[in-house]
Swiss-Prot record:
It comes from Buxus microphylla. This is Small ribosomal subunit protein uS11c. Part of the 30S ribosomal subunit. InterPro entries: Ribosomal_uS11 (IPR001971), Ribosomal_uS11_bac-type (IPR019981), Ribosomal_uS11_CS (IPR018102), Ribosomal_uS11_sf (IPR036967). Signal peptide: none annotated. GO terms for cellular component: chloroplast; ribonucleoprotein complex; ribosome. Residues 9-23 have a biased composition (Basic residues).
Amino acid sequence: MAKPIPRIGSRKNGRIGSRKSGRRIPKGVIHVQASFNNTIVTVTDVRGRVVSWSSAGTCGFRGTRRGTPFAAQTAAGNAIRTVMDQGMQRAEVMIKGPGLGRDAALRAIRRSGLLLSFVRDVTPMPHNGCRPPKKRRV
């Protein structure tokens, strides 16, 4: 019978690499993507590695309720709560998109107690690039 091959870096040898929740993050970047159908809030560290994220869909909102301001407020609160436990005190906010959840998400971020260094609108605007899709006829 053949000898078993010893595994290098198995779970028995202990954890390799750092766990996400173990990091202390004093400063981060909060990205809010607000479309008409959903609002996604992603919290990253300064280097751009994702620490936490939430969306209106993951908070339990379905259908047209995902695009509401209340759903965006709930999603922002969920994403920020986890990073506050990891020690985040200061943040920059980048808001993208035309959705209804823009202001509600920003209001929830302000209420959370984080010190905001700046709030920037990074919505992509064409310099007359591609032709837009035809208008809807309902």
